Amino acid sequence: MLDGKQDNGNVDSVDIKQRTNGGGDEGDALGSNSSSQPNRVARMPVDRNAPYYNMNHKHRGMAIIFNHEHFDIHSLKSRTGTNVDSDNLSKVLKTLGFKVTVFPNLKSEEINKFIQQTAEMDHSDADCLLVAVLTHGELGMLYAKDTHYKPDNLWYYFTADKCPTLAGKPKLFFIQACQGDRLDGGITLSRTETDGSPSTSYRIPVHADFLIAFSTVPGYFSWRNTTRGSWFMQALCEELRYAGTERDILTLLTFVCQKVALDFESNAPDSAMMHQQKQVPCITSMLTRLLVFGKKQSH
């Protein structure tokens, strides 16, 4: 457990020069390359070697929830129970200090427009950004009210070169959606900013400081209870309530994965194929420091 004295980045810097490999670095890729303007400069929110993200800005930051219940696409059923997810997530994020905005049933163009507008805002006084999407999905695509779109449309505009006021800050994406139609039958296991600091400036990759959490692994089904909400959101909200101000986010998400994997099993006795199925979330982290939603200090 971390106490109120946890260091959020106000540490004495250590003058460690950027590691070089003596030349000869090559990329493991074919074809032409494009650059993301590496010479752009953004404000340094935390010392170069700080172990924790600075979560002591004036505001925690924006939390955006795209909640999809109904669709114009005839093949997609209404997502009964998603409002439970949206309400529970909104409540727990507010307790962690986020400014939460919920958007129900937006069309693809509306989502894209709001994402771009958010990226153009000044996030200098914010700790981080959080985006959650509750919807139907398939492998490599999510559904808006009217059509599908690629998941990376959600974070494309928030890379450090496009949104410099979030450079060096956590950008978190939680996606509750199927990633395919494969089922997991499981297996039984038996017992046999700191201004004025002496730290020098440093460069970071534009895709650093992202975390993307999908409710299930690529190609697989994601389960939702029509009364209690989706398994992933139930577990995420419970862990955020229990230890959101104490555990770092990757440790917390490890226990979310544990809860989904062990505590949930589909109950569909009328369908042998769908009955007693399992699920586990899939976490991709480009975070470069530990992230803890510690209690906000007064400013």
Swiss-Prot record:
Coiled coil: none annotated. CDD domains: CASc. Gene3D superfamilies: 3.40.50.1460. SUPFAM superfamilies: Caspase-like. Its EC number is 3.4.22.-. InterPro entries: Caspase-like_dom_sf (IPR029030), Caspase_cys_AS (IPR033139), Caspase_his_AS (IPR016129), Pept_C14 (IPR002398), Pept_C14_caspase (IPR011600), Pept_C14_p10 (IPR002138), Pept_C14_p20 (IPR001309), Pept_C14A (IPR015917). Residues 1-45 are annotated as: Disordered. Residues 1-28, 185-195 form a propeptide. Keywords: Apoptosis, Hydrolase, Protease, Thiol protease, Zymogen. It is an enzyme of class 3 (hydrolase). The active site is at H136, C178. GO terms for cellular component: cytoplasm. The two subunits are derived from the precursor sequence by an autocatalytic mechanism. The keyword Protease applies. Involved in the activation cascade of caspases responsible for apoptosis execution. Inhibited by the baculovirus anti-apoptotic protein p35. Cleaves p35 and nuclear immunophilin FKBP46. Heterotetramer that consists of two anti-parallel arranged heterodimers, each one formed by a 19/18 kDa (p19/18) and a 12 kDa (p12) subunit. This is Caspase-1.
